[in-house]
């Protein structure tokens, strides 16, 4: 209370250079008043707005409250009112692509991607693999070649790792000379995050007995194109998994059923699906997928053939193109940030190129290569923002992928 006996008013909010982003000091001072504004709300709903007063008997009994509900199905699916929350089989221009299924990030919240909505890319369709017949063979420069089935792998001690998987070509529209007016799904939909459970590859290699001269292993999938990639042996002993579960379920067919290689932080194509072969070698295979399909052309025409790590990155998920904002007020700007190194220091955001603000986030180093949520409130007065831009900063100060 003030000396005059009147309840003091909270200080006026400070804006950052008129661009709508709230000053962090103002947020700290007004933390109670504006707690609602810090909630990661769905775009289209004003956060921190006062509710309309109603009478105590305003609720009426709708039809669903007056009859028995349906019998729960053997496999639960989302409500019929969520029918638009689906993957899209198209490129960013909306052209049909039967090999691309993009995650609807702008319609989701949190960091775990539901299995049915996890992105997938398949070079030769989704194979219908009988797990009773599928085998994984480890051979090459080993003391004892070994063979594994899904059943035998299930007998080993299993470990779980939270990790994102991202296509090397994700966010390609950001390199367009003209900004594309499309959703976060269309631009950034080729990345998803899950809890993967399986057997550490190092345990299987130790059992096989790897020759000290083996510096690489070649991972090959059982799809009709036999995708293969060369991986340094060191990665196998760091954190590689032969994954057989995805968010507690056996892998989805589009994500590698019955088993896949998981290389946290590495390009998606290196996380070989339908894993059937691991061959220990002293030289990389120099296959089509690593010399052409997934190599980078550098200035001057040279090719960077073995670029593994997915660098620090963030993008805005809400609001996204096509989502309506219900009048002026405060809205949560939400997104995700991730890095192949697992060392994100902060994420920054600006509206229409105004002053820069950090997004609110708690980065837990132990979480490693997994997507992490970020959010900040943004004031939308009676004006229009052309762009909201975010970027992640690694602990060493490195910045990559500045996206609006």
What is the role of each PLM region?
Residues 1-26, 35, 49:
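N-terminal secretory signal peptides
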Residues 2, 18, 29, 45, ...:
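Generic cytosolic/nucleocytoplasmic N-terminal low-complexity/intrinsically disordered segments
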Residues 15, 20, 40-43, 53-54:
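Compositionally biased non-globular segments, especially hydrophobic aliphatic-rich helices
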Residues 23-43, 47, 201, 261, ...:
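N-terminal export leaders
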């Amino acid at each position: 209370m003030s000396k005059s006996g009147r309840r003091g008013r909270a200080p006026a909010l400070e804006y950052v250079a008129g661009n709508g982003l709230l000053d962090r000091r103002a947020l700290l001072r007004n933390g109670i008043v504006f707690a609602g504004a810090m909630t990661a709300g769905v775009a289209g709903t004003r956060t921190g707005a006062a509710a309309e007063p109603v009478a105590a008997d305003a609720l009426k009994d709708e039809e669903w409250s007056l009859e028995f509900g349906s019998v729960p199905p053997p496999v639960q699916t989302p409500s019929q009112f969520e029918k638009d929350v689906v993957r899209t089989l198209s490129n960013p221009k909306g052209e049909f692509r039967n090999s691309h299924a993009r995650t609807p990030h702008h319609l989701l919240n949190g960091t775990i991607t539901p299995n049915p909505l996890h992105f997938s890319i398949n070079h030769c369709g989704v194979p219908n693999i009988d797990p009773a017949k599928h085998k994984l063979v480890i051979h090459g420069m080993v003391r004892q070649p070994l063979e594994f089935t899904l059943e035998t792998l299930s007998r080993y001690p299993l470990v779980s790792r939270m990790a994102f998987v991202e296509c090397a070509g994700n966010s390609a529209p950001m390199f367009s000379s003209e900004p594309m007016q499309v959703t976060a799904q269309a631009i950034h939909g080729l990345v998803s995050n899950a809890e993967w459970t399986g057997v550490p590859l190092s345990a299987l290699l130790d059992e096989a007995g790897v020759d000290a001269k083996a510096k690489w292993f070649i991972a090959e999938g059982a799809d009709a194109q036999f995708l293969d990639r060369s991986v340094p042996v060191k990665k196998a002993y760091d954190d590689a998994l032969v994954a057989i579960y995805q968010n507690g379920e056996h892998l989805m067919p589009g994500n590698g059923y019955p088993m896949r290689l998981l290389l946290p932080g590495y390009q998606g194509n290196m996380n070989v699906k339908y894993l059937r072969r691991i061959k220990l070698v002293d030289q990389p295979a120099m296959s089509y997928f690593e010399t052409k399909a997934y190599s980078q052309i550098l200035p001057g025409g040279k090719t960077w053939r073995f670029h593994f790590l997915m660098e620090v990155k963030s993008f805005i998920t809400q609001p996204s193109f096509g989502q309506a904002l219900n009048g002026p007020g405060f809205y949560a700007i939400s997104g995700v940030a991730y890095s192949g190194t697992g060392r994100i220091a902060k994420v920054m955001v600006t509206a229409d190129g105004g002053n820069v603000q950090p997004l609110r986030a708690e980065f837990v180093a132990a979480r490693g290569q997994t997507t992490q949520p970020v959010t900040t409130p943004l004031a939308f007065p009676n004006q229009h923002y052309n762009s909201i831009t975010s970027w992640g900063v690694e602990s060493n100060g490195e910045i990559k992928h500045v996206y609006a």
